[in-house]
């Protein structure tokens, strides 16, 4: 994949060793540490329009999720354990410790947001604040899977099918699939919101059969272990205790299932939120508005 360092001016590259393999990250800026996590079918590059603005106030760590982008791919098992959001969160905590950050702020989009809220539920003492972009909790998505929503996020069921069914089908035309997925979730319904260099980065990553397998394992974990972890928390009345911001696209995925802020109030003790004039990909479709909201939230006194 192309390096694309020019999309992250002032950032350096880090390969961070953990007990489950290396995590790739770009690190830039000075100030309190802020970890940014991407989603499917992307890499850390999706933050390129927002990270430099955040780096004016924070030390920003933009990481590839375990198995995605340039991060190592932990070997999976029948329970998809390394790709549960719980396991991913633990590995990213370890990576942050390696960088010297035991306590940090966290923002995640899509799958990265699922890792983020799981980290907040399992290890709240690690976080100062949490932001999630264009998601509802995994449990809520599955519980709200009516006809309209099942058609909109069909990939949740498709990618969760037993291996190698989705892997083999995706291998028929991976370039078409990844570009179609990106375009279909934007407000405009095309690729015009993306930097072409970023799209090429996502395309090359998705072209790797092993990376596609990891993405399927991510969704298999979401359909089984992640759902059960969420179910235990919601039934026990456990809530995210740290200050939380929920942002969603006015034309995004989360708002089409429910009113996001109402849902998150069931899951978090101190949550605020608002829509962004965007589709699903807030940091690329509406970077100024997204960056402004994140800076305001993370800069405010607790």
UniProtKB/Swiss-Prot annotation:
EC number: 3.8.1.3
UniProt keyword annotation of Hydrolase present: yes
Binding site for fluoroacetate: 111, 114, 155-156, 219
UniProt effect for mutating residue 155 to N: Reduced catalytic rate with fluoroacetate, but increased catalytic rate with chloroacetate. Minor effect on substrate affinity
Catalyzed reactions per annotation: a haloacetate + H2O = a halide anion + glycolate + H(+); fluoroacetate + H2O = fluoride + glycolate + H(+); chloroacetate + H2O = glycolate + chloride + H(+)
One Pfam family recorded for the sequence: Abhydrolase_1
PANTHER family from the UniProt entry: EPOXIDE HYDROLASE
Protein name: Fluoroacetate dehalogenase
Annotated source species: Rhodopseudomonas palustris (strain ATCC BAA-98 / CGA009)
């Amino acid at each position: 994949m192309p390096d694309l360092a020019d999309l992250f001016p002032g950032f350096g590259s880090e390969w961070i060793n953990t007990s489950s393999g290396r995590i790739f990250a770009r690190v830039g800026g000075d100030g309190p540490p802020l970890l940014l996590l991407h989603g499917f079918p992307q890499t850390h590059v999706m933050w390129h329009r927002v990270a430099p603005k955040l780096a004016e106030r924070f030390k920003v760590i933009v990481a590839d999720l375990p198995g995605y982008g340039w991060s190592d791919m932990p070997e999976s098992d029948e329970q998809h354990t390394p790709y549960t959001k719980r396991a991913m969160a633990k590995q990213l905590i370890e990576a942050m410790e390696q960088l010297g950050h035991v306590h940090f702020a966290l923002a995640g989009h899509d799958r990265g947001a699922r890792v983020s809220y799981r980290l907040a539920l399992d290890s709240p003492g690690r976080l100062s604040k949490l932001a999630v972009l264009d998601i509802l909790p995994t449990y809520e998505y599955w519980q709200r899977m009516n006809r309209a929503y099942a058609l909109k996020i069909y990939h949740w069921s498709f990618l969760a099918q037993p291996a190698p069914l989705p892997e083999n089908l995706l291998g028929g035309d991976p370039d078409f699939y990844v570009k179609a997925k990106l375009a279909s979730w934007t407000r405009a319904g095309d690729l015009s919101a993306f930097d072409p260099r970023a799209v090429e980065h996502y395309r090359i990553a998705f072209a790797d059969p092993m990376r596609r397998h990891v993405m399927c394992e991510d969704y298999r974990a979401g359909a089984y272990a992640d759902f059960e972890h969420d179910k235990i928390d919601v039934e026990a009345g456990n809530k995210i205790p740290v200050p939380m911001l929920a942002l969603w696209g006015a034309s995004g995925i989360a708002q089409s299932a429910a009113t996001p802020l109402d849902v998150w109030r069931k899951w978090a003790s101190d949550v605020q939120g608002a829509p962004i004039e965007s589709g699903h990909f807030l940091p690329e479709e509406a970077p100024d508005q997204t960056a402004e909201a994140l800076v305001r939230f993370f800069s405010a006194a607790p």
